[in-house]
Amino acid sequence: MEDLEEENFTLSVSSPKDAEFDSVVGHMEDIIMDDEFQLLQHGFMDKYYHEFEDTEENKLTYTTIFNEYIGLVEKFIEEQLLLRIPAFNMSAFISSLQCHREEIAGDIFDILLTFTDFLAFKEMFLDYKAEKEGRTVDLSCGLVVTPLIGSSVSSSS
């Protein structure tokens, strides 16, 4: 007789709170990738990117811009989430972020971080400013693609 290997299957059951959190994150991904959000965020950054300088010192105007950004972007995301999840509570979601920090996709986490972390907000503006001023590194110029296996091309013309 054949020896049958025993297979173990593990069923992962998440709590209702975890499922709710995952649902909110999924909706946030949709909102952030949507053209309406992209236009809102880029329009705001276009308006203020020239104010930011890459120095240790932070201008007082940064605080005003930061507070305006939080009001505009957080409000937009919250309104969009309420349309999708009528019982959504932003305060409860933000407090549950610490428990799920490792589970959140990079883009979502970066956006959320700009609501609470001023340095992340400033870095976002400095990156945007560098891009607008053409100071980003374009790696495509120096890339050369060569085959790993030498191909023999016969030149029998």
Swiss-Prot record:
Q: Tell me one Pfam family matched here.
A: ARL2_Bind_BART
Q: Where in the cell is it found?
A: Cytoplasm; Mitochondrion intermembrane space; Cytoplasm, Cytoskeleton, Microtubule organizing center, Centrosome; Nucleus
Major location (coarse): cytoplasm
Q: Which domain of life is it from?
A: Eukaryota
Looking up InterPro entries in the UniProt record yields: ARL2BP, BART_dom, BART_sf
For this UniProt record, the keywords arranged alphabetically read as follows: Cell projection, Cilium, Cytoplasm, Cytoskeleton, Mitochondrion, Nucleus
Q: Name one GO cellular component term.
A: spindle
What function does this protein fulfil? Answer: Plays a role as an effector of the ADP-ribosylation factor-like protein 2, ARL2.
Q: Which family does it belong to?
A: Belongs to the ARL2BP family.
What is the protein's name according to its record? ADP-ribosylation factor-like protein 2-binding protein
Q: Which organism is it from?
A: Xenopus tropicalis
Q: Which gene encodes it?
A: arl2bp
